[in-house]
Amino acid sequence: KALRAPEHKLTVTGVRELAPYTELTVHCPSLLGANTAILPPTAWARMWIQQGGRQHQRAYTLTRINREHATAIILVLHHEPSGPASRWAKRVKPGATVSVQMMGGTSYRPPSPGDRMLLVGDQASAPALADAVAASPTSSPATVVMLAPEAGFLPLAARDHRLIRVNPEVSEEKLLAAVDRTLWADTGDLALDWVFI
């Protein structure tokens, strides 16, 4: 907060458990309303969680923004050991408020129609990847390589795309090999137009 970026108050209006996530519906006219600057896909906010007499900063993607109703969805991933944001999300109730700042998090270059897209990430970045695919032209073939278990909820874009889940226990080398195999199988080369990692 020392950098004095504009601060907004998000009001939690809905809470839903989608293990391993908690889905929060938030309302904020000053950030998400029809008269505010349009946030690009994958935009993320710095959330300030009050806990143990301190404020802890965590960044979360604002997805499915509805400017008419000034709402968005935030997915908080739970893992062990749990951190301040995870503990807060597990007990938060509708009506609670939390401070956020937009300081960075809005750089985004959209793909052009027909661009071949590759997106690589894990469960923490899954909301941003889903947001990027959903906002892309339907003529752009998209492949998502996700470091995530085969079972369990994973946020996905509604539009047609290819999803490859890779066991989180594998090494980075095996993950990269899986990406290479996928591209060679699809195209016979490694040419890509747009990459999001």
Regions found by a protein language model. Give the residues of each.
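FNR/FR-type flavoprotein reductase catalytic core
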Residues: P84-I197
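Intrinsic-disorder/low-complexity coil detector
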Residues: A5, A19, C28, L39-P40, ...
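Ferredoxin-reductase
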Residues: L3, K9-K90
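Generic, low-specificity signal for short hydrophobic/alpha-helical stretches with a mild N-terminal bias
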Residues: H8, H56, P111-D115
